[in-house]
Amino acid sequence: MLTRRIIPCLDVKAGRVVKGVKFLNHRDAGDPVALAAAYNAAGADELVFYDITASSDERAIMVEVVERTAAEVFIPLTVGGGLRSVEDMYRMLRAGADKVSLNTAAVYNPHLIAEGARRFGSQCIVLSVDAKRVNAPGEPPRWEVFTHTGANPRPTGLDAIEWIKRGIDLGAGEICINSMDADGARTGYDLELLQAITAISPVPVIASGGAGSPADMYRGIVEGGADAVLAASIFHFGDYSIADVKRYLAERGVPVRQTFGSEVGTSTGA
């Protein structure tokens, strides 16, 4: 088994990190640059920033956040939210991001994936998918892709598994799958969804949505087949540290990069 990655996710709104439950009822979690620096010191393997405002007037704030963060951290940084063109991707990569995450824009313009992969390489393109279970009880499992996830998520009619297959064919180098049913609920990842995706994906898969404990992350990797596990609230609000998770995984035979940094506490919300 290859080394598995632990990735804190920072949802950024108006220059602050927030976290909600199923995309609603956001709580302030702190300053993004301070949190990123703390996670870097604590041994996180990567960081993900999502600009959940993503309006044109907020975009300059996000570019500045990425620039300041890139000057402080020395682990890969992925940035997503509102990236609608190759130029948008270029601005974030130039600001210091290592990868860009495409979601809603890719659904409405799938060739944006191919254009980004052609310009920057597949290793820079993460296809992020928000999926909701839509099968009736007793039916085979089925998940639909939603866009504009927030206060007004929009169904697309796209089957999540088929959309991911197409995204990979177009050049996505990594998949981040977020269970809308589990997001922020801290009841564990949707293992059935993860299994369905990892069974067909030749590229790395990041599990997102639902992590409430190191045990959930272990199951996401061992049972779900994820290459990396992403979490937000359990880290932001001090329930567990990166070291707690890595220790739990290592004790159960999951290979992780050793952590030598400090713990992430609640003092990063300046």
UniProtKB/Swiss-Prot annotation:
Active site: 11, 130
Known pathway: Amino-acid biosynthesis; L-histidine biosynthesis; L-histidine from 5-phospho-alpha-D-ribose 1-diphosphate: step 5/9
Localization terms from the record: Cytoplasm
UniProt record, GO biological process: L-histidine biosynthetic process
Catalysed reactions, semicolon-separated: 5-[(5-phospho-1-deoxy-D-ribulos-1-ylimino)methylamino]-1-(5-phospho-beta-D-ribosyl)imidazole-4-carboxamide + L-glutamine = D-erythro-1-(imidazol-4-yl)glycerol 3-phosphate + 5-amino-1-(5-phospho-beta-D-ribosyl)imidazole-4-carboxamide + L-glutamate + H(+)
GO MF annotation terms: imidazoleglycerol-phosphate synthase activity; lyase activity
A GO cellular component entry from the record: cytoplasm
Primary localization class, coarse: cytoplasm
EC number in record: 4.3.2.10
Pfam family, one: His_biosynth
Entry keywords, A to Z: Amino-acid biosynthesis, Cytoplasm, Histidine biosynthesis, Lyase
Family from the record: Belongs to the HisA/HisF family.
Subunit (UniProt): Heterodimer of HisH and HisF.
NCBIfam families: hisF
Known role: IGPS catalyzes the conversion of PRFAR and glutamine to IGP, AICAR and glutamate. The HisF subunit catalyzes the cyclization activity that produces IGP and AICAR from PRFAR using the ammonia provided by the HisH subunit.
Protein name, entry field: Imidazole glycerol phosphate synthase subunit HisF
Gene (name only): hisF
